[in-house]
Amino acid sequence: MTSLNDIRSTFLDYFGRQGHAVVPSSPLVPRNDPTLMFVNSGMVQFKNLFTGVEKRDYVRATSSQKCVRAGGKHNDLDNVGYTARHHTFFEMLGNFSFGDYFKEDAIRYAWELITKDFGLDKARLYVTVYHTDDEAFEIWKKVGVPEDRIIRIATSDNFWQMGPTGPCGPCTEIFYDHGEHIWGGPPGSAEEDGDRFIEIWNIVFMQNEQFADGTMVPLDMQSIDTGMGLERIGALLQGSHDNYDTDTMRALMEASAHASSTDLDGDQNVHHRVIADHLRSTSFLIADGVMPSNDGRGYVLRRIMRRAMRHAHLLGAKDPLMYRLVPALVSQMGQAYSELGQAQALITETLKLEEERFRQTLDRGLKLLDDEVAKLPEDGNLPGAAAFKLYDTYGFPLDLTQDALREQGRTVDTDGFDAAMAEQKAKARAAWSGSGDAADATIWFDIAEKNGVTEFLGYDTEVAEGQVLALVVDGARVDKVASNQDVIFVTNQTPFYAESGGQVGDSGTIRTETGVLHVTETRKVAGVFLHVGQVTEGTIKVGQGASLSVDHERRRYICANHSATHLLNEALRWAIGDSVVQRGSLNSRDRLRFDFSHNKPMTADELAQVEAEVNDLITRNTAVETRVMTPDDARALGAQALFGEKYGDEVRVVSMGHHAGSGKGLDKDTYSIELCGGTHVKRTGDIGPFVILSESASAAGVRRIEALTNQTASFYLSEQNERMGQLAAELNTQAADVLDRVKALKDDRKKLENEVAQLRRELAMAGGTSAPEAASVNGVNFHAQALSGVTGKDLAGIVDEHKARLGSGAVLLIADAGGKAAVAAGVTEDLTDRLSAVDLVRAAVAELGGKGGGGRPDFAQGGGKDAANAEAAIAAAKTVIEGV
């Protein structure tokens, strides 16, 4: 049987032989496209090539693209597990031409691949063309498809548009006939929705540009975009019409069945299908840098996770299940996607943690859903308010509730749910509103196309000469700028580092023969460095020569923080394990911030170990080395990379420190090796002192460390030392003895507090108001007393002393705490079978302006707003005793 891995390789190898660049899949998180939640097709990473705003060193490409469809317009989540071809995660095989070949070659390549390399029966293949696309019709005839199997389609199914305006063009699709034993008709027929004729490949001919008025003109650059789902063609080549019968999906489902000790087929099958699919999407999303959260992409990830976890619950799994399936996934797909193996520890830890948390509420949430359903008529649907309560209180996404109700033939009032969710949706929309930059990205692409990308000189120098290529004010290009104008300044080369990889951009000064620019920040778009600042003297014109000078002191501090971050990252891995993965960072002038995956607070000992190890590496003052190499060579050395980052053919590798047990580097003794494009110190000693300020939660499963280095750390330590001296003087001791002195003071205070409490109890036992002596009520010795000068905390001990004195009986005490009442009651063990202290407290509290009260039959506590009603409260408690 041909495996999915073999099919993927066959596809890519075929187009590689046809001169296509084999381009790796992009991460699932789109770059520079805030309108798209996840990559959902093969063309996404090539979008700027199709629109002409970007150029690369190839004009034809092929890829197997990771895709997720679980939100927004393309949302397959509800159907996953119940149909043969719906997935949240799938791979899209594609070949692309950017102004190179067009219809004839695209059709010829497709036909040759599927009939020769894949060996599909030509007699079972049908094709569709757009009804006016005579050219495609004739090409299909030319390659050998009979006219009666070339179907003209007049609907939008065979006409592709990027949007209301922009590139568009007709499509041609290839269908496979599974045979008469399966219901359905050919495309365009009344029975086309059946499963007999299945589309396996879509080929888009981008040949026109559409304008807002509906007119179309031919594109100057005509292109090809194709897509073929790997799972769909895999099912066909493996003799099935169900994607879940493919070898990869079957292996994951078998792993699910084994881990849950359940049958693979029968009633359990749908659960295993959901788990297998969702395992792929969640694992790849985590590997590409998405973590579960309550908004944005992280919320979609959490929804997918929790849907799978509910199906694991329905299988009867008593313990977390998903994380135990990760090795099976890595075994199936890790060779094609190395990021799975690299992120395996993080994926495993994240899945386990999320499932442990969700299982704590799942049973309660499902019980609440059952209670709500029990109130409904036989064919009633769940009100939106109830569904929102599940979401708001128990973290149940709407689709999880819908999924649970689906099995009962019920639905949810989604309009009611949407109304309850309006505020959250508004916040979510605001979060996706984009960066708000005045200048459209096309400006920078135009500059890059005309002048090339900016050459960065800042690894070797902080001063350089350049030429002014562009000036941008309020989103528009201008020829010159005058004093006090804010401007974005572009040169052909620069020593200024542009913000990226967690490192802030440089600031400094740029001078021309006629003016001076103060640079406050440096950014980068499409390889163009943007110097953002204000003209402080004279005027500056496009075409002038420029002298660029980076703020040396600021850069020095930033470099120290960035290099320290590398050492911190590795020290954390040594201290708490390989599950530590960088989740974010900020390296600024003043401090560094490092976010990392970890599911609990670090201990004081762990933090001390990390801080000491980083400082030890700093004091060794070893050289910081940088080399440029291929990503594969870097990984072979053990270099750490950021999950979700896409790297080019060459990467910059930063190495520092030595550790005999590291196993990394050429000599297997390098402490830290990371792929990094930032600027760093020359030697570790240049970092200076390293001080951890804090460790805290940043998000679920993510911790954050903030730290100082260099002179900032020295100032901090000096300030702390000064404060310690002041504290020692205040305590009349030496700095080294401050801790012992504080402990002694705390012990003295505790002793005095105990003595005061004992005195209050003795005073309370000796007097007070309202029946200082016990009275017999219904045969029960009852001591009731309103006290002053005691606190609520004192009452428990006083109640116990009165119970001991009575031997058999009940006690009620009310303390006046600044006008409010603290109440405590006790009943001796011999009476608790017929009298409860809880009932006494509740009766008393009701008279004191309070509610409730609780505890055990032998002791209970409560409180009220008005201690002045103590007499009425005692009388109410007495009534309770009289009634037993």
Swiss-Prot record:
One of its GO terms (biological process) is negative regulation of DNA-templated transcription. Binds 1 zinc ion per subunit. It is an enzyme of class 6 (ligase). It holds the Pfam family DHHA1. Zn(2+) binds at H562, H566, C676, H680. It catalyses: tRNA(Ala) + L-alanine + ATP = L-alanyl-tRNA(Ala) + AMP + diphosphate. Catalyzes the attachment of alanine to tRNA(Ala) in a two-step reaction: alanine is first activated by ATP to form Ala-AMP and then transferred to the acceptor end of tRNA(Ala). Also edits incorrectly charged Ser-tRNA(Ala) and Gly-tRNA(Ala) via its editing domain. Consists of three domains; the N-terminal catalytic domain, the editing domain and the C-terminal C-Ala domain. The editing domain removes incorrectly charged amino acids, while the C-Ala domain, along with tRNA(Ala), serves as a bridge to cooperatively bring together the editing and aminoacylation centers thus stimulating deacylation of misacylated tRNAs. PANTHER family: ALANINE--TRNA LIGASE, CYTOPLASMIC (PTHR11777:SF9), ALANYL-TRNA SYNTHETASE (PTHR11777). Belongs to the class-II aminoacyl-tRNA synthetase family. This is Alanine--tRNA ligase. The gene is alaS.
